[in-house]
Regions:
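Enzymes that bind and transform nitrogen-containing heteroaromatic metabolites
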Residues: 1-220
Length: 220
């Protein structure tokens, strides 16, 4: 386990749900590029990959899939010994929550991932749409008009997927929070507000609050 992964340990056994996100100083979860990449950086990406590398499943919303253009979840040779020792499959499984089932099925994330993605949707779709989805993913149909996080987690646990990372978007993270199913929040605060960069001047933890000061960067 590398130094970054050691900062984000998983319990040795049992079920555990992490919520992971990056946000700007103004509360934005998307940057000037319309996605999270312009808020992120090498250190944040290293944390994201370290958490994923020891997870069973990564849960995202359909819009996050479309905007962020997720790459295939492949089996990485350098991680196989570590994953096997922890009882994990060859790669994390991607789980997509989509009420509409209107997904980019031609994307490599569906055609080239080591394990077929799971897609959680709602009842009421016609047979043709469900059949198309099932050509590319394992489809879970929730009862009712929404995908309840507790129901989804039970479905994942039944498939022996116990280490869960929810990467958003914002609405899905909110649904998980409202359902009270999150065990840990891993939040990166970017020094961006809009297109303006700020630098951390001070931080302190007191009485359960994290107090920070960021000052505007003046280049040159």
């Amino acid at each position: 386990m590398n130094d970054v992964a050691a900062r984000y340990p998983w319990p040795a056994t049992g079920r555990y749900v992490r919520a992971m996100m990056v946000m700007g100083l103004d509360g934005a979860t998307v940057g000037p590029d319309g996605g999270s990449r312009s808020l992120s950086g090498p250190a944040d990406l290293a944390a994201l990959l370290a958490i994923r590398s020891h997870s069973d499943a990564v849960v995202i919303g359909a819009e996050t899939l479309r905007v962020e253009r997720y790459k295939p979840f492949r089996a990485k040779p350098e991680l196989q010994e570590s994953r096997a020792a922890q009882g994990l499959d060859i790669a994390p499984r991607l789980v997509i929550v989509s009420a509409s089932l209107k997904l980019p099925w031609e994307e490599p994330v569906f055609t080239e991932s080591a394990l077929a993605p799971l897609v959680a949707t709602v009842a009421g779709h016609d047979a043709a749409r469900l059949d198309r989805a099932r050509e590319h993913a394992e489809v879970l149909v929730a009862p009712g008009s929404r995908v309840d996080p507790a129901w989804l987690l039970d479905e994942l646990y039944a498939r022996r997927l116990h280490r869960i990372v929810c990467e958003g978007g914002r609405g899905l993270l909110g649904a998980f929070a409202d359902a009270g199913v999150i065990d840990e929040w891993d939040v990166t605060v970017s020094g961006m507000a809009g297109a303006t960069r700020f630098d951390l001047a001070e931080s302190r933890d007191q009485d359960g609050f994290l107090f920070t000061r960021f000052t505007r960067r003046h280049d040159g």
